[in-house]
């Protein structure tokens, strides 16, 4: 099985916070369901499937896709796993948050 993506530390922290918040607000079953949807969204973006927006004007190669209530940001790489840069809630100031992320 080939790894299609890797989570940068900041994206991993985003995912942990999403899990914590979802579990606290809606319980374990909803958390599992939401995480499966996010995982599918991450996989799709990593492989260039589905709908995504080219954000190269912000950073070379950067892609963004909406998944449920979040936006996933990814930098695909040739012959290497895609880098997942951030997973941010739709109500956040996305560009401000991204500016503080490693590039």
How does the language model describe each region?
Residues 11, 38, 84:
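Hydrophobic pocket/interface hotspot
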Residues 20, 40-43, 86:
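Generic alpha-helical structural context detector
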Residues 75-103:
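Enriched for short, Lys/Arg-rich terminal
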